[in-house]
Amino acid sequence: MQMHASTGCVLMASGLSTRFGSNKLLAPFDGQPLLCWAFAATDTPQLSARIVVTRSAQVQALCKAQGVPVLLHALPGRNDTVRLGLSALLAQHPELTGCMFLPGDQPLLRRATVDQLLTAFAQTQKETERVIFRLGAPAGNGPDPLVGSPVLFSNGFFPELLTLPEGKGGSVLLHKYPTLVHTACIAQPEELADTDTPAALAQLEALVREKG
């Protein structure tokens, strides 16, 4: 049983953006690079530490300019990004009781939502050492919610996160341990939306303008 939650965050920024055509994390969104919205969403005292893991020197430069810790690497797999990020956090903060993983391309995710997820995670950790939390939102056309990132893992999963199968991410553990997965539902499904293509980015920008 955890008495005090100390949670880190790995910002996943190692993708090649093949469908986007260029590095989407540097694409402008509502006045600043897309990745900066992930910085804002995770700028909360509920996180003990965070780190961006990337293969892009340009992303590395942006992180340094914004004062966000960053790790530059050249390894190909999603498992590599998870392992490198978590290892870097644990090297500085071995006391971590949980780690959140967030892709850098969800610009509508709000800090209040991240705080809500972290609070729910910490409350549940008081009762069990092995728990996974993810975000969900109403699907609109069925009983099952949309689910997405970020995803939080308690430290009972750290050994497996550090040894994921080649090319696989943390979703492997969600499928392996479905009874340990909790979904924190939010009202706005667009917070889960990512931007794999320029059209998807433009659609989210239009939504921002529409909501004012």
Language-model segment annotations:
Residues 36-100, 112-113:
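Conserved N-terminal catalytic core of the sugar/cofactor nucleotidyltransferase
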Residues 2-5, 159, 163-212:
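Conserved alpha/beta core of the MobA/IspD/sugar-nucleotide pyrophosphorylase nucleotidyltransferase superfamily
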Residues 1-22:
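N-terminal nucleotide-binding beta1-loop-alpha1 segment
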Residues 9, 50-52, 132-133:
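Hydrophobic/aromatic residues located in beta-strands of well-ordered beta-sheets
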